[in-house]
Amino acid sequence: MGKQQETILIIGAGIAGLTTSRLLTNNGIPNIVFEASTPDRSQGFAISLQEFGYSALLAALGDLPLSSLIRGVAPDRKIGGSGWIDQALRDNRTGEVLVAPDLTTTKQTIVRANRNALRHWIVDCGEDELDVRYGHKLQRIEGKLGDVTAVFENNAKYKGSLIIAADGVNSTARSQILPNVVPEAIPLIHYHGEFQISHSAFDELIRPHSGHSNILVGVGDRFNTPLSICNITKSQVHLDWSYSRTVKGENDILYCPNVPSEEAKQIPPALLEELDTLSLAEPWKTFLNSESLKAHRVFHWTTRCVYITQDDARHAGEQGVVFVGDSWHAMPIFGGEGGNHALLDGVELANAIITSTESSGRGSWDNVAKNYYGGAWKRSQDAVRRSTQRFFLLHRPATEWKEISEKKKTLA
């Protein structure tokens, strides 16, 4: 039983949970990952990995080269691509480039990554298999730091020394341990669509506008329409789009922050009507219209943020729970840094555990939480605020985008 209680229990098999598990496993520290969903769950949209996130992960995995990550996760990896993006913002009503970095002097520091591929790549970065148990939805947590029990809805119970809450923005662990911490809904409309086209159609309809970039970002008058590659092969291209805008008054029919999960998969007629009035340029015009959406999988996304105080983090640690990922620093997807901070969380928490274990032969769990939060708390909470501000700036009026574009031209 003593050995079992030294096991670390990780709730959630997302990026943060798997990163932590992989690094602990590589260092011989027993851990189990519990995931509520089934192994075939799909979350195949792409995210932007920044240098501060992936460099820490590559170093922790034994100084792996960036090329290893790119070959494993880039949306265009199967056709020899590198996950490159041009970082340009285009007027989605004319196609004109409004803002773009000088790519002749800028090295690639951002890598687009397919989320499913990233999870698989992390899992495969070690000789020993990770112990991931699917179909385990957390019900409650019992005990205290050093001797804690996770109870699941399937009646399974597991004892461990520490629980790592990697169960996302709607974290069950957080809602029990810190019921006062409630995700904050941002007043924005956000719809996400997924679809597939043939590679030849992609070359005809999108490639002339995007070039080799894995994302084509369109900005309008307080609304955005990014079009992104999720996965590309020689025959098929899986893409997604987002339509996001600020809320229009108190009675905005499309603003439904508490919509039930099943209803969130339905396309409201008001969205179709709105898209048809946007006067979009190509290629957005071809895909974001009422007729095209009939063949797409469309989801309503509520953008939420999570803030946790240092006292909250300390209190949770005393009860045997440490947070990683969106469970304690959820931030906007478009313009956010969430995936990168999830990687850093996993790296920094694993390092705190490994260091503690090496110095004492077993985990000094008080020091683990203290050392981890010593750097991670400010880093991640600052990122939530920064990302939220950036999210609103990316939904600015068209007149402001024009002013920014003209100023850039003047300085060029």
Curated annotation (Swiss-Prot):
> Known InterPro entries for this protein?
FAD-bd, FAD/NAD-bd_sf
The EC number of this protein is: 1.-.-.-
User: Its annotated pathway?
Assistant: Secondary metabolite biosynthesis
> What cofactor is this protein dependent on?
FAD
Q: What function does the entry list? A: FAD-dependent monooxygenase; part of the gene cluster that mediates the biosynthesis of neosartoricin B, a prenylated anthracenone that probably exhibits T-cell antiproliferative activity, suggestive of a physiological role as an immunosuppressive agent. The non-reducing polyketide synthase nscA probably synthesizes and cyclizes the decaketide backbone. The hydrolase nscB then mediates the product release through hydrolysis followed by spontaneous decarboxylation. The prenyltransferase nscD catalyzes the addition of the dimethylallyl group to the aromatic C5.
Report the PANTHER family cross-referenced here: FAD-DEPENDENT MONOOXYGENASE APTC, MONOOXYGENASE, FAD-BINDING
What is the enzyme's class at the highest EC level? oxidoreductase
Signal peptide limits = 1-21
Q: Which family does it belong to?
A: Belongs to the paxM FAD-dependent monooxygenase family.
Positions bearing carbohydrate: 92, 170, 231
Any one GO MF term held by the record is: monooxygenase activity
What's one Pfam family here? Answer: FAD_binding_3
Q: Gene name, please?
A: nscC
Which positions in this protein are listed as binding FAD?
Answer: 35, 46, 119, 326, 339
Query: Any idea what this protein is called?
Result: FAD-dependent monooxygenase nscC
The UniProt keywords, alphabetically, are:
FAD, Flavoprotein, Glycoprotein, Monooxygenase, Oxidoreductase, Signal
Domain of life, per lineage: Eukaryota
